[in-house]
Amino acid sequence: MTSVIRFALLSLCLSPLLLSLLGSQTASAADWPTWRHDAGRSGTTTETLPENLKLAWSRQLATPQPAWPEDPRIGFDLVPEPVVVGRTLYLASTRTDSVTAYDTRTGQLKWKVFADGPIRFAPLVADGKVVFGSDDGCVYAVDAQTGKPVWKFQAAPSS
């Protein structure tokens, strides 16, 4: 099965699951538990930022690996899309096939988990779990604090 068809199947299966998880959680205004903040993809928050922001830490990330490098119209996975809940930043990677958790205050690595294919979209954090899909056709859930696997679902054929 081509990667485009596998990706479409995974997206169709994953969307209702992620929306149901997101609708069941209660997040503070400071949290950013999914891509563009909330189920409505508003990209806004009521959280007030301090007037004098300062860089606390930074990380050099691997250059993302595009899904279709020959098609200039498809650039959705060229930029990492972090999500933040509490003191943890979660970041998916197409280059390392992983989701990594960092402490937001120190930048220290908390944990890193791997899938069997690139992870092209931001994970979702809900009910103490980090949920993400991979090009391997699977949807994964790991414990948000430890990164330990909670469940794995084969949502689309692997090839």
What are these regions (language model features)?
Residues 24-30:
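Boundary at the C-terminal end of the N-terminal hydrophobic targeting segment
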Residues 153, 157-159:
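Solenoidal tandem-repeat scaffolds enriched in leucines and small polar residues
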Residues 103-106, 143-146:
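Short loop/turn segments that connect beta-strands within beta-propeller blades
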Residues 30-64:
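Blade/loop signatures of beta-propeller domains
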Residues 8-24:
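Bacterial N-terminal signal peptides
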Residues 57, 66-71, 108-113, 151:
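A short beta-strand motif characteristic of beta-propeller blades
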Residues 32-36, 71-99, 113-140, 157:
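Repeat-blade elements of multi-bladed beta-propeller folds
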Residues 1-7:
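N-terminal secretory signal peptides that target proteins for export/translocation
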